[in-house]
């Protein structure tokens, strides 16, 4: 199953990064679904992360009934949805024992860091504050471990919304942890293309 996690800066779930992407995977023969998660003021207290973990758990619970391989669940996260997908693989949800994790990640121009190259608006929506210190809770490049699932990621060098440094920081962390990954960096292309 490929579970598509659209972006939208945690302000909305982008329609063009949801069903159209899922339909492309379906046309290639994959089971697909699109995660619609809490955004705006509803996104506080890591609710989107909880919803993603619950979705993965639900798919595994019904895997036989839905004819899905429970150990082959990939998340396709786009932009802020890439942050959410990567969070689902590496971020510990407080008070959630046996947190369901994906088996692979497909990330398109993901938000990764709350540091120098952050997409500040995503972190402000997620935390409800402009306080950069509060954003650090959701930075991900320092949470990569050898247990992180394999990653495919792509980004464009001229993305001005989510700087390519987000992907470069991720790649460095994946390399240091020995996590299998493949990356495609394109010279041209604005955010969302």
Report residues per predicted region:
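Short beta-strand/loop motif that positions the catalytic acidic residue
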Residues: 147, 152-155, 159
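Catalytic nucleophile-loop/oxyanion-hole region of alpha/beta-hydrolase
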Residues: 13-15, 20, 33-70
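Primarily recognizes the serine-hydrolase "nucleophile elbow" in alpha/beta-hydrolase
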Residues: 54-122, 135-136, 140
